[in-house]
Regions:
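Conserved catalytic or regulatory cores that recognize and/or transform ribose-phosphate-containing ligands
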Residues: 18-174
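Bacterial N-terminal signal peptides
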Residues: 7-15
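Hydrophobic alpha-helical context, especially transmembrane and signal-peptide helices
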Residues: 6-8, 41-42
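Positively charged n-region of N-terminal signal peptides that target proteins for export
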Residues: 1-4
């Protein structure tokens, strides 16, 4: 009887410890922190959302990406540099923002860059240059972007997947 009881307990413990983790998506922005148990959990894929923000005046494509990943069966942390209350005049804010982005670009397992056609996006071009060789970047660039050919040629040269609109990229995630 004791052997049977130990067998049942061992089986239950193994089944609990081997249960797959539940799907989850977290969005992390500058000046925010993840719960400690999430930040230590290596089962999450970390994705940096690089690209057009235009001081918060552009399409909130980061929210669309979040919605898409929320529908998927996986565990994701989305690093989103877009701040709700961005204030470049606050002392130290620019340095904090740039370093936050650089740190999280390096930490990411994947970089999704979206450049809107109506934007100049000089920082996005800089980030693309820094990470094109990383093997972890996908670029979405609308054809009416004023430097589209530069982006297209660079993506081709380094083997970076290039999409012309967000919807085409999102379709690849299904």
């Amino acid at each position: 009887m004791r052997r049977f009881f130990l067998y049942i307990i061992t089986t239950l413990l193994l089944s609990v410890s081997c249960t797959p983790k539940q799907p989850a998506v977290y969005m992390l922005r500058p000046h925010e922190e993840l719960p400690e148990e999430i930040s230590r959990d290596n089962s999450f894929t970390k994705i940096f959302l690089a690209g057009t923000i235009d001081m918060g005046n552009s399409r909130d494509w980061q929210a669309e990406i979040h919605d898409k990943f929320s529908e998927m069966n996986g565990r994701y942390i989305l690093y989103n540099p877009r701040q709700e209350n961005w204030d470049a005049t606050r002392p130290g804010e620019m340095e904090y923002q740039v370093k936050w982005e650089l740190d999280h670009l390096e930490d990411a397992d994947m970089i999704i860059m979206y450049i809107l056609g109506t934007s100049k996006s000089p920082i996005s071009l800089l980030e693309m240059g820094l990470h094109a060789k990383s093997g972890k970047m996908s670029v979405i660039c609308e054809k009416d972007f004023y430097r589209y050919d530069n982006v297209r040629i660079t993506c081709d040269y380094y083997g970076v997947p290039l999409y012309n609109d967000l919807e085409s990229f999102l379709d690849t995630l299904e």
